[in-house]
């Protein structure tokens, strides 16, 4: 079983990833993955896509047929198109309702597994020391601050550890992002200067 130290840390990693990537992006990705599963919803989605292609093909056929010179053929194509369009719109409404229900379920599950879990842990373990401080290393006021609000004096409370994790993760991600941008910029600069150097040697 994970210790309280790692549990709180991983919860904050999850919260940071959700906030960075974006809840809507995660919801869309999970929806696409859900549609890959053998469920009634995925079958509805496949049928909707088939009808969409069928509607476009029938519309193209109808537009390429003259309503004056070939009225009977055009009218038949129009009836087929209208029927397919009705089926497509009905399936689209069904799929939209299913997606709304899916998004709501995912939203609840995401909150419970991130912020909800964080709040629960802070409440449930409010009096539990996350880890003890070395004896006589810190003055009284420091021990009081890091044990705030309800942990035993001389230990780190879950509230303080939670804030430390959130700050550390955010700063680490920011530093890594800055380093990545710098590395990519240097490589791009090297690629741009390489052809210039080669042309200079040829000219000599």
From Swiss-Prot:
HAMAP family: Get1
Topology with respect to the bilayer: Multi-pass membrane protein
Residues that span the membrane, as ranges: 5-24, 111-131, 156-172
Assembly and binders: Interacts with get3.
Keywords, alphabetical: Coiled coil, Endoplasmic reticulum, Membrane, Transmembrane, Transmembrane helix, Transport
Lumenal side: 1-4, 132-155
Cytoplasmic membrane side: 25-110, 173-204
PANTHER family (UniProt xref): GUIDED ENTRY OF TAIL-ANCHORED PROTEINS FACTOR 1 (PTHR42650:SF1), TAIL-ANCHORED PROTEIN INSERTION RECEPTOR WRB (PTHR42650)
Coiled-coil ranges (or none): 43-99
Pfam families registered for this protein in UniProt: CHD5
Superkingdom of this protein's organism: Eukaryota
Annotated family: Belongs to the WRB/GET1 family.
Gene Ontology, cellular component aspect: endoplasmic reticulum membrane; GET complex
Underlying gene: get1
An annotated GO BP: tail-anchored membrane protein insertion into ER membrane
Protein name: Protein get1
Function: Required for the post-translational delivery of tail-anchored (TA) proteins to the endoplasmic reticulum. Acts as a membrane receptor for soluble get3, which recognizes and selectively binds the transmembrane domain of TA proteins in the cytosol.
